[in-house]
Every structure is written in structure tokens, then in C-alpha cells.
Regions:
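Formylglycine-dependent sulfatase
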Residues: 1-363, 371-398, 402-411
Length: 411
């Protein structure tokens, strides 16, 4: 939630001069976060990257939510440029050597999109992902003798399309000439495919650096690394998901990828690495969600957490053992793009769309035979639809914010 009651939160110049317009509505202090639990059990904790759970000077800043150290964006909107005017270190605003180019700016009128000089304004001096990476390295180096937890929420490869020139040139040679993206949203790019690939390679290189550092410090076999994403690929800002098969075997276009509850939007890779503990190259089809990381990590750390959560530990799956405890179902709900609910029950996936348009009908897909969710089999399985309906009703919570409430539900 952008917390628009504060003023024009989309005026980037105003936000730069008044941090009270920055950030999102804060996570309540009464919420006991995973970071607070692990911090209270002797771990050094850090959040590096993009934070959107509490604006500056609120109870929601990372330092108030269980993190000893924070470096990065404290605002989702500010992360719409990878060359920001500032970042935050703990609760201190760090001014960078970048002039303000408001996110979503386009090429100047009359500019030639095929001339590299037209894009000079969009490649500045201090690249946020590089600054964050250095801080991640510093945190690990300063805690090699401590138990530590690092949540590294890299802004890569989120648009806008901005990447180190060495990688952009590498992919320009591989991909050849291409149609420029002239910036209908986010920023323009002369070589959008090459730049997107460059962003991925930058992230890959940074992850490799961290793994090498853990090995160099002789703590790799005592460190669990989990690499995953918060959503499927985007289709905006010049990103060509279909060209890269970004969601394969799912669909990567609007209506099916990021922001939507089809598989292309919510099913993401999850890679876990723990030297000498997790079998290399092993693969699991265990049905899981990010809420399960909570209890999994606590179990591995030997931390007892008595409060009931939605997650289950998947330690046995990581270790190649039988996963006795499994989800009966997974549930998703988002107010964006018309309002959506989804339930995954075994091979079946139920989706309700356009709730704000008073739609209450539910589509049903058999993922075992229709992974792209193209054949609605709701009429064939009325009892499964009834079950999905009960789950949606049980799991839904009326939003505290009126604009997120569904009138179709009598709210």
C-alpha cells in the first residue's frame, strides 16, 4: 500500500526532499517477524536490498523488525530506478552521486532511439545493485565467527532495464541488433533484450561471489543458501519474457505472469544449497510456499516457535527424506488486477478473477494434464469447486483498508 494519504507520493523530487512521503504503509510493531525470532536467539541479522514494509521513521523500518543492519531502498517506488538519488543505511539517508531522473521518464522529444547518445541520462554513476552487493560482502566478512541471517532482496532483475555496460555489450554481441524500447513505462533501452540478460548475469555473478566468499571463509558447509523469487516474470518495461522463455512451461504474457494467480505469476524456482548436507542436483515436487521457509529455517537452527503459522517445515525434503507433513492446500489472494483468489489442491488449481466486478465464478484447471491452465474443467468437478469455495471463504480476511475490500463479499 502506497499510503497516499501523506501527499503526492509519486512526485520523486518531493520525495527526495521529504522522506515522510517515502516508503509504504508500515508493518505493525505487534507482528512478531521471523527476523525478530532468529535475532532473539543469537543470530546477527541483516536485510539488504528492497524493503517495502515500513516507511522511514515508522515502526516498520527493518531495524524495528528484527534486523541489526539494513542497507537499500526503503520504498518500492524509489526502486523504479537502479541509479537512485539515495539509499538508506539503517535509519540514515545516504545521498548518492546520481542526479534525479524521475522513474518512468521517456526519451527526449526528437531523440533518435537508435543513437546511444539518446540514453545517456539513464546510465548514471552509482548502481544500486553494486552498492548492495558490497554491503552484503561486508556483512558476511564481519560475521564469519557469528551465526548470521542475511535476507538479500536484490532489485535485480526488476525493471527498469539498467545494467553494467560490460554485460550489456556481451549480450549485444550474442543477440545482435534489436528493436529499442522507447520507454512507455519505466525507462527506455536501446538494447532491451541484451540489457535484461545483462541484469540476470549481474545477479548470477553476485550470487557466485557470495558463495565463493563463504567457501573462502570456510563456512560454506555451515550455511544454508536459499535462492528464490517473489513472483513470476514481468511483461512490462521492455522485458520480452516470451523471447527468453522466462516462465517456461507457463505463459509469460499479461494476464498470466507477474500480478496474476496463474502458474506463470506465482510458481517460481526455489534452489537450496547446503554443502555436504543437501544432495547436489536433487529435485523435489513437494508442494510448498514461501511461508514454509519460516519453520524450515527455525527447525534447522534448533529454535522452538510455539505460535501457529500457515507454514510447514520442509527440512525432510531438503535432506532427501520422506516429507510426512504436507499442505492440504495452498491459498493466494490479491486485490490487484480486478481482485483474485486461488487455491491449489493436489493437481487441481481453482482461480476466481475480477472480484471487484462482482464475479464469483471459479475456474478449475488440472495441472497434471494442463500445466498452462487453458482448459476450464469446473463443470466436470462440482465437488472440487465446492471445496475451493469453502477454502476461499475460510481463508479470506476483510481488509483493514477499505479500497482493498470486495463488495461482492458484502464488504
Amino acid at each position: 500500500d502506497e499510503w497516499k494519504e501523506r501527499g503526492n507520493v509519486w512526485d520523486y523530487e518531493a520525495v527526495f526532499h521529504d522522506h515522510n512521503l517515502e516508503g509504504q504503509r508500515p508493518l505493525l510493531d505487534s507482528i512478531n517477524t521471523f527476523a525478530e525470532i532468529i535475532q532473539n536467539n543469537g543470530y546477527k541479522t541483516a536485510f539488504i536490498g528492497k524493503w517495502g514494509l515500513g516507511a522511514p521513521d515508522t515502526e516498520g523500518v527493518p531495524n524495528n523488525q528484527g534486523f541489526h543492519y539494513f542497507f537499500g531502498y526503503n520504498c518500492q517506488r524509489q526502486a523504479h530506478t537502479l541509479y537512485p538519488t539515495h539509499l538508506w543505511e539503517n535509519e540514515k539517508k545516504i545521498i548518492l552521486n546520481n542526479k534525479l531522473i524521475p522513474p518512468h521518464s521517456n526519451l527526449e522529444i526528437g531523440s533518435n532511439p537508435n543513437n546511444s547518445n539518446s540514453y545517456i541520462n539513464f546510465s548514471l554513476n552509482e548502481y544500486a545493485p553494486e552498492l548492495m552487493h558490497r554491503k552484503a560482502v561486508e556483512f558476511i566478512e564481519s560475521n564469519t565467527d557469528n551465526s548470521f541471517f542475511l535476507l538479500y532482496a536484490s532489485p535485480l532483475p526488476h525493471v527498469p532495464l539498467q545494467a553494467p555496460i560490460k554485460w550489456v555489450n556481451y549480450y549485444r554481441k550474442k543477440l545482435g541488433s534489436e528493436q529499442p524500447y522507447t520507454g512507455k513505462s519505466y525507462f527506455p533501452s536501446q538494447s532491451p533484450r541484451a540489457t535484461y540478460a545483462a541484469m540476470i548475469s549481474t545477479l548470477d555473478e553476485q550470487v557466485g561471489d557470495l558463495v565463493a566468499l563463504l567457501s573462502e571463509k570456510n563456512i560454506l558447509d555451515n550455511t544454508l543458501i536459499i535462492f528464490t523469487s517473489d513472483n513470476g516474470p514481468t511483461y512490462t518495461g521492455g522485458v520480452d519474457g516470451n523471447f527468453f522463455n522466462s516462465a517456461k512451461p507457463f505463459k509469460a504474457e499479461y494476464g498470466w505472469a507477474k500480478g496474476f494467480l496463474h502458474e506463470g505469476g506465482i510458481r517460481v524456482p526455489m534452489i537450496a544449497s547446503w554443502e555436504n548436507h543437501i544432495k547436489k542436483g536433487s529435485v523435489s515436487d513437494h508442494l510448498s510456499g514461501f511461508q514454509d521457509v519460516f519453520l524450515t529455517v527455525l527447525e534447522l537452527a534448533g529454535i522452538h516457535h510455539p505460535v501457529e503459522t500457515d507454514g510447514i517445515s520442509f527440512v525432510n525434503t531438503l535432506m532427501g527424506l520422506e516429507q510426512k507433513e504436507k499442505h492440504k492446500y495452498l491459498y493466494w489472494e490479491i486485490p490487484e488486477y480486478g481482485g483474485q483468489q486461488a487455491v491449489r489442491m493436489g493437481a487441481f488449481k481453482a482461480i476466481r478473477k475480477n472480484i471487484f466486478k462482482n464475479n464469483l465464478s471459479i475456474e478449475l484447471f488440472d495441472l497434471a494434464t494442463d500445466i498452462q491452465e487453458t482448459i476450464n474443467v469446473a463443470d466436470q468437478y462440482p465437488k472440487i469447486i465446492e471445496k475451493a469455495e469453502r477454502i476461499m471463504k475460510k481463508e479470506h480476511r476483510k481488509s483493514v483498508l477499505s479500497r482493498f475490500r470486495f463488495p461482492a463479499f458484502g464488504e
